[in-house]
Amino acid sequence: MRIEEFDYELPEELIAKYPAVPRHSARLMVLNRKDQSIKHDTFINLPDYLEEGDLLVFNNTKVIPARLYGRKPTGGRVEVVLTDFIKPDEWKALIGGKKIRPGLVIEVAPDFKVEVLEHIEEGKFRVKLLGEEPLKLIDKYGHIPIPPYLKREEEPIDRVYYQTIFAKEKGAVASPTASLHFSEELLEKLKEKGINFAFITLHVSYGTFKPVKVERVEEHRVDPEYVKIPKETVEKIKETKEKGKRVVAVGTTVVRALETKPFEPFEGWTDLYIYPGFKFKVVDAMITNFHLPRSSLLILVSAFAGREFILKAYREAVEKRYRFYSYGDGMLIL
């Protein structure tokens, strides 16, 4: 398949620059794969489309303030954006400026430095964080790396709303955005209906914003990301399936995590790239946001629901002035 087949026209003003407040006030488009119907609703009414015994699987990763500002030994200012978690004190990073070489030490603060270990490719490096408890130092000195297409600086609202309410495991540099719509009030409504919850961890990397640059979509590769699927989550998934109920993945990160090692507890790395033709073994339904044209995420949802149906839904979303991307509205695919 050609990448042009995953393109669509999006007016700039439909890119959501700020989050919906409250979270559950975002709009919800409901796609039914069986009858190819499209309905329009609001996220607070999500329980109306789920059944008692269905299982919602969330990504509990926590976005770290991965944008760091420091100085080289010469005194020159430099920006470091941590892009890929390797371990708490080791990351891949984008570093701006010239003369960035292995051995360079960038001072973020007297108690926090970044050492360049290896040049990976143009502008990208492997780095070591120097200081006690690096994740705490990132929290102290870093800035939230809001998506580049927002075209604005980080604001206080982003510290709250670019994080899910169940964010727990530090390591993501981008939010698992489908989960941003869930408020305490919505979770209570879901519990009252008998909907069950489970969690995985996938540390979303900066690669989530990477456009597909190859002509044939089958040749694209996604960056490896750290994933952990606990035994308890696998057991809940199996129980749900045995009862004939649905496993609902909240976000493309959860889809990729669950389909990497179906029905197995797992901790490691996934570079699973899902495109049309993929056979889904675990996921029965999916909640997701509206994705960028020509992106691996749009290709993934097309694999799940069919390219033509998805593009028809996107055209309708544009007509009805839905809000797009990370802070935008959402979609439930049944």
Swiss-Prot record:
GO cellular component: cytoplasm
Alphabetically ordered keywords of this record: Cytoplasm, Queuosine biosynthesis, S-adenosyl-L-methionine, Transferase
Coiled-coil blocks: none
Localisation per UniProt entry: Cytoplasm
MF (Gene Ontology): S-adenosylmethionine:tRNA ribosyltransferase-isomerase activity
InterPro entries per UniProt: QueA, QueA_dom1, QueA_dom2, QueA_sf
Catalytic reaction(s) noted: 7-aminomethyl-7-carbaguanosine(34) in tRNA + S-adenosyl-L-methionine = epoxyqueuosine(34) in tRNA + adenine + L-methionine + 2 H(+)
GO BP terms, alphabetized: queuosine biosynthetic process; tRNA wobble guanine modification
Pathway membership, UniProt: tRNA modification; tRNA-queuosine biosynthesis
One Pfam family here: Queuosine_synth
UniProt main location, coarse: cytoplasm
Enzyme Commission designation: 2.4.99.17
Subunit record text: Monomer.
Function: Transfers and isomerizes the ribose moiety from AdoMet to the 7-aminomethyl group of 7-deazaguanine (preQ1-tRNA) to give epoxyqueuosine (oQ-tRNA).
Family: Belongs to the QueA family.
NCBIfam families: PRK00147.1 (NF001140), queA (TIGR00113)
Full protein name: S-adenosylmethionine:tRNA ribosyltransferase-isomerase
Organism placement in taxonomy: Bacteria, Pseudomonadati, Aquificota, Aquificia, Aquificales
